[in-house]
Amino acid sequence: MKPPIFFLIMSTVISGTLIVMTSSHWMLTWIGFEMNMLAIIPILMKKFNPRSMEASTKYFLTQATASMLLMMGIIINLLYSGQWTVPNNPNPMASILMTTALAMKLGLAPFHFWVPEVTQGIPLSSGMILLTWQKIAPLSVLYQISPTINPNLLLPMATLSVLIGGWGGLNQTQLRKILAYSSIAHMGWMTAILLYNPTMMILNLTIYIIMTLTTFMLFMLNSTTTTLSLSQTWNKMPLITSLITMLMLSLGGLPPLSGFMPKWMIIQELTKNEMIIMPTFLAITALLNLYFYMRLTYATALTMFPSTNNMKMKWQFESTKKMTFLPPLIITSTMLLPLTPMISILD
């Protein structure tokens, strides 16, 4: 893709998200979602092959269905209240339709089916945008309408997302699918706390985006997409590979790394709201995520995969990619836990 075209498409993606975030009119919100969806498809198809075309088609069909449900909810709300304002008190049926549509756009269970397949079929750079930037717009709308969301609908989806995000990643060897299931689980954590402390959801989203962004950038720097290729990168980039193992443990939520902080704060907040069963279930299912990340770290750092004598060793020229923001991102992704008291005071 030529740089001017890529710049134009990325500008449209960013503009669509900003329109959704700043709009207080339902029609403008819907238009922002459509701009975002139509502009991201050429980025998903950056490598023109059958797999990326299939992934883009799945993404388009899912997002178009979600947009249709969202518009149905908006129209029902308009007929009920006569207003286009976003944070008004919608009709219960409209609220259910809107929540379902936004859950489909986010990839919450049971509407998670598209996330692993789409992420696996696209390049690492496109997957990075899909699992980070594309989560901002739906979560911003959920944040605005959080007082009117039915908890009997959202909380079961949140707990199911955390369970499926951990369970689905157990049997994976493809790094993109592992990150996709991890994204489903993180979305579950965010929507679980949304109804009780929306500000904490923003904190969780920020930390998730930083960690996922850094992990994808290191995978791109290392040119690795599978567990096998990751285990063979010690000879060419030992420092980057060791940083990847640290980041994966942070994504799994292992203390004392940054990924543990949002989980700790969410469990604490849910307990303050006199909820016992849900934070217990979330903590137990989070161990599934931690298990497959620890298994991946163990396979990368402490074992050698079986190989034949004529198997080619991975090598490459010195990387020419300029990633200026990588060092501060790595520090933030791994060493944020000591700042928890200060962040909790601000919250």
Swiss-Prot record:
Q: Which GO terms describe its cellular component?
A: mitochondrial inner membrane
| Top-rank EC class of the record's enzyme | translocase
Taxonomic superkingdom: Eukaryota
Chain ranges passing through the membrane: 3-23, 25-45, 59-79, 96-116, 122-142, 149-169, 178-198, 201-221, 237-257, 274-294, 325-345
Q: Which family does it belong to?
A: Belongs to the complex I subunit 2 family.
Q: Which Enzyme Commission number(s) are on file for it?
A: 7.1.1.2
What do we know about how this protein assembles, alone or with others?
Core subunit of respiratory chain NADH dehydrogenase (Complex I) which is composed of 45 different subunits. Interacts with TMEM242.
Q: Where in the cell is it found?
A: Mitochondrion inner membrane
Question: What the protein does?
Answer: Core subunit of the mitochondrial membrane respiratory chain NADH dehydrogenase (Complex I) which catalyzes electron transfer from NADH through the respiratory chain, using ubiquinone as an electron acceptor. Essential for the catalytic activity and assembly of complex I.
**Annotated catalysed reactions:** a ubiquinone + NADH + 5 H(+)(in) = a ubiquinol + NAD(+) + 4 H(+)(out)
- Write one Gene Ontology MF term: NADH dehydrogenase (ubiquinone) activity
One Pfam family cited in the UniProt record for this chain: NADH_dehy_S2_C
**Principal localisation:** mitochondrion
Q: Name one GO biological process term.
A: mitochondrial electron transport, NADH to ubiquinone
Could you tell me which PANTHER family the record lists for this protein? NADH-UBIQUINONE OXIDOREDUCTASE CHAIN 2
Keyword vocabulary terms for this entry: Electron transport, Membrane, Mitochondrion, Mitochondrion inner membrane, NAD, Respiratory chain, Translocase, Transmembrane, Transmembrane helix, Transport, Ubiquinone
**Topology versus the membrane, per the UniProt entry?**
Multi-pass membrane protein
What protein name applies here?
NADH-ubiquinone oxidoreductase chain 2
